[in-house]
């Protein structure tokens, strides 16, 4: 289930970004899309002069993207924040026992930490929280997160969509 959610989540994130949904919505509402900000993307093929520097960057970037970020973010969100806002005795609260406040906290974190991709973040963070509530397994969230991030990394290199880097 985690693998499937990771793939679906990655496809949704990439699709939302390719369609530029956030900027379109802001424009339709009469607001400037610049208000959302953008990530400072880097094209590693232009930035690094030597091939060894490029390979080191890509290996490090993918290790961070696929291993470090999913573990750290899921520990903070699922291991702490969602349970903390649900119950003062959060250490003893099982993963699947979080309620609406926990769901809102996790999704709110995702939206606030990815403002230029907030629609994708809203959908993705909700999906991963629902996965956690269904399976009650922390590592399912990490696996789904890793797969989504891996898909995003491959997409970024393939499409040269450096704003997502």
PLM regions and their residue ranges:
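Interfacial transmembrane-helix boundary/kink motif in multi-pass membrane proteins
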Residues: 1-19, 23, 27-38, 45, ...
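Transmembrane helix-loop-helix hairpins at the membrane interface
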Residues: 12, 47-165
